[in-house]
Swiss-Prot record:
Keyword tags: Amino-acid biosynthesis, Hydrolase, Methionine biosynthesis
Name of the protein in question: 2-hydroxy-3-keto-5-methylthiopentenyl-1-phosphate phosphatase
Catalysis performed (reactions): 2-hydroxy-5-methylsulfanyl-3-oxopent-1-enyl phosphate + H2O = 1,2-dihydroxy-5-(methylsulfanyl)pent-1-en-3-one + phosphate
GO MF: 2-hydroxy-3-keto-5-methylthiopentenyl-1-phosphate phosphatase activity
Associated pathway: Amino-acid biosynthesis; L-methionine biosynthesis via salvage pathway; L-methionine from S-methyl-5-thio-alpha-D-ribose 1-phosphate: step 4/6
Taxonomic placement: Bacteria, Bacillati, Bacillota, Bacilli, Bacillales
UniProt-listed InterPro entries: HAD-like_hydrolase_phosphatase, HAD-like_sf, HAD-SF_hydro_IB_MtnX, HAD_hydro_PyrdxlP_Pase-like, HAD_sf
Organism: Bacillus anthracis
Catalytic EC class: hydrolase
Entry's family note: Belongs to the HAD-like hydrolase superfamily. MtnX family.
Pfam families xrefs: HAD (PF12710)
GO-annotated biological processes: L-methionine salvage from methylthioadenosine
Length: 219
C-alpha cells in the first residue's frame, strides 16, 4: 500500500479561487448568477464553468495572465509540504478544475507538468471555450468537467491510501472516496452535510504536521 495525495489548486494551493477572481475582474454581471447556480448544484460544474468562460472575450488573454501573476498567492507552507512529500516518496498529484493557461504558469518550478491534471482552454474564437480532457468514467454521472474521483481511480490502486486536499464543491466527489480528507472553506460544509470525516486546515504546515503523524502511525 502506498500513500497517494490528490490536491486541488484554486483556493487550496492558492489562497484565492483564481476562476472566481477572473470572473470578478473580467466577466459581466450575469456571471454571478451562474456562480450561485454552480454552488447550489443547480448547474453541473461542467455546465457552469463552460458558461462562465463563454462570458470572457479571448482578447483579454494577456491581461488575465498578468492579473493572475500579480494577484495569485501560493498558500503558506506549500513549498515545505512538497519538499516533505518528495523526501518521503509520496505520490502527489494536482487535480484541478482550473485552466491550463493559469495552472501551469503558477505551478512552474514547483510541480512537474506530468503530475498536474487540469482543463484545457481554446482562445481561437471570440470567447473562451473550455475543453474537458478528463471526463467522468462509468462510475460517475455528475458531469464534473474534470472528474476528480475518476482521476483518482485512474491514477491509483484500490489498495492505496488516498488523501484528498480541497476547499469547495468541486472536491466533494473525490472526498467521498478518500481515506483521509483535508478540508477548508465550503468543502467543510459539504463534508458535514454528507457525513464525511475531515481534518480542517488553513496552511500546508497543518497538512504536513498531520501527514507526518500519519506516516509514523502507518510505519
Amino acid at each position: 500500500m502506498s500513500i497517494q495525495v490528490f490536491c486541488d489548486f484554486d483556493g487550496t494551493i492558492t489562497n484565492n479561487d483564481n476562476i472566481m477572481s477572473i470572473m470578478e475582474k473580467f466577466a459581466p454581471p450575469e456571471a454571478e448568477e451562474v456562480k450561485n447556480r454552480i454552488l447550489s448544484q443547480e448547474l453541473s460544474i461542467q455546465e457552469g464553468v463552460s458558461q462562465l468562460f463563454q462570458l470572457i472575450p479571448t482578447n483579454l488573454h494577456d491581461e488575465i495572465i498578468q492579473f493572475l501573476i500579480e494577484t495569485a498567492e501560493i498558500r503558506n507552507g506549500f513549498h515545505e509540504f512538497i519538499q516533505f512529500v518528495n523526501e518521503n516518496n509520496i505520490s502527489f498529484y494536482v487535480i484541478s478544475g482550473g485552466m491550463d493557461f493559469f495552472v501551469y504558469p503558477l505551478l512552474q518550478g514547483l510541480i512537474p507538468k506530468e503530475q498536474i491534471y487540469c482543463n484545457e482552454t481554446d482562445f481561437s474564437n471570440e470567447y473562451i471555450t473550455v475543453n474537458w480532457p478528463h471526463p467522468c468514467d462509468r462510475l460517475c454521472q455528475n458531469h464534473c468537467g474534470l472528474c476528480k474521483s475518476s482521476l483518482i481511480r485512474k491514477l491509483s490502486d484500490t489498495n492505496d491510501f488516498h488523501i484528498v486536499i480541497g476547499d469547495s464543491i468541486t472536491d466533494l466527489q473525490a472526498a467521498k472516496q478518500a481515506d483521509k480528507v483535508f478540508a477548508r472553506d465550503f468543502l467543510i460544509t459539504k463534508c458535514e452535510e454528507n457525513h464525511i470525516s475531515y481534518t480542517p486546515f488553513e496552511t500546508f504546515h497543518d497538512v504536513k504536521t498531520e501527514l507526518k503523524h500519519l506516516l509514523e502511525v502507518k510505519l
